[in-house]
Amino acid sequence: MNNSFTLKQQWFGNIRKDILAGILVALALIPEAIGFSIIAGVDPMVGLYASFCIAIIISIFGGRPGMISAATGSMAVVMVSLVADHGLQYLFAATILTGIIQVILGISKIARLMKFIPRSVMIGFVNALAILIFSAQLPQFEGASWSMYAMLAGSLVIIYVLPRFTTAVPSPLVAIIVMTIIAVTFHVDVRTVGDMGNISSSLPHFLIPDVPFTFETLQIIFPYSIALAFVGLLESLLTAQIIDEMTDTDSDKNKESRGQGIANIVTGFFGGMAGCAMIGQSVINTKAGGRGRLSAFVAGAFLMFLIAVLSHVVVKIPMAALVAVMVMVSVGTFDWSSLKGLKKAPLTDSIVMVVTVVTVVVTDDLSKGVFVGVLLSAVFFVAKISKLKIVSHAEDQKLRTYQVKGQIFFASVTDLTNAFIYQEDIERVVIDLTEAHVWDDSGAAALDKIVAKFKEQGIEAELKGLNKASKSLMKQMA
């Protein structure tokens, strides 16, 4: 990949496209933020304030230019019971603590753990997210009139056909503007952004959560904050990796982790809910040409401008146009080549990808899908490397040599122990471990057990060819 942009390039190297992409993202953020607020059981303005604050702060402190962060559904799901049981002020306190935890994790270089997520899990994550984005649009069609479908079709035509003639302005932005003008001019009876929830023109202001500063409060919010911190970082770092690949650039994921934390701390003090990177909006931004920090900054700033100044216009935007944008995102996000790859890839990789997708879709939780995928990959990997190759041959009537090739650890010791002939009319056995490695106490104990079993039969057993690390472990466990 190319080297990361300089700070100047990150802000001003792509001004026109970053501004236009940011405007498009701001428009697409509104129904998302409102919808996620409803999921969390809070006022729509809480999600909108969060999206504004997080987008602005992450544009400054984040480690992945061009990535969009705001209020998200995965975070909203975690908050539901906290809001229901303890109220909004505890949510603000939990959001601040979430940010503090994320900053600490960022300083601890948590992003290093990303290397343990296999490609098959990444592909499963992306495909599952595409399915979730698409399925999230389906409720908009319940009881919809023909005009809804007509505007959806018209929006999709603009989105996919306009780029053939010009790319000066993002086609999804043109689709939203054109459909809004048509809906307002001809009084088309379609569902609008205003139907999603009440949007006031008030700006966020600084506040300190009205909760007791006691250990009991910490006991209440800490479990939620831990969950929010890890879910947020997982989704953010995976999204950063995807945008890295889409743009062929590098990102500083530890800086991104710290940036997410700072953004959530600020958000909590301004009446917002915890958020993280949004892959859907990030893909919209990337496909619209957004590459720099300016795109995220414009998205946050324009979102607040829309709320504070143009809320009377925003509420008239037809949902059909925004649904069309999200359909475009879901189609563009899905890795269609992975379907062909199912037959070509190793069976275990295909199983991991499919299981990851199914887990996410069934649970509606990206973090659970990734966890199951990584766990399954680990099981398959352990099964693969636990296979030992053991060859034996008799040197003479008194000596037999065993050559062991492979990894000796907890998963391979049963096969190892059963591979030897303990009752044989010989005097001496040599176990050649030149091409083997002892990894843990299970492996060391198994070798000791093998030697002891030969000794019980009056046969002398010698371990030969242990490498330095294996020999050290054997001495340590003796």
Curated annotation (Swiss-Prot):
A cellular component term, taken from the record's GO annotations: plasma membrane
Chief location bin:
membrane
Name one molecular function that GO assigns to this entry: secondary active sulfate transmembrane transporter activity
Q: Where are the transmembrane segments?
A: 19-39, 42-62, 65-85, 87-107, 121-141, 143-163, 168-188, 220-240, 259-279, 295-315, 345-365, 366-386
Q: Indicate how the chain sits in the lipid bilayer.
A: Multi-pass membrane protein
UniProt domain STAS: residue ranges: 389-478
Q: Does the keyword Membrane apply?
A: yes
Record SUPFAM superfamilies: SpoIIaa-like
Instruction: Provide this UniProt record's keywords sorted from A to Z.
Output: Cell membrane, Membrane, Transmembrane, Transmembrane helix, Transport
Name the Gene3D superfamilies on file: STAS domain
Report the InterPro entries cross-referenced here: Membrane-Transporter-like (IPR052706), S04_transporter_CS (IPR018045), SLC26A/SulP_dom (IPR011547), SLC26A/SulP_fam (IPR001902), STAS_dom (IPR002645), STAS_dom_sf (IPR036513)
Residues forming coiled coils: none
User: Where in the cell?
Assistant: Cell membrane
Family recorded in the similarity comment: Belongs to the SLC26A/SulP transporter (TC 2.A.53) family.
Q: What is this protein called?
A: Putative sulfate transporter YbaR
Q: What is the lineage of its organism?
A: Bacteria, Bacillati, Bacillota, Bacilli, Bacillales
Q: What's the gene?
A: ybaR
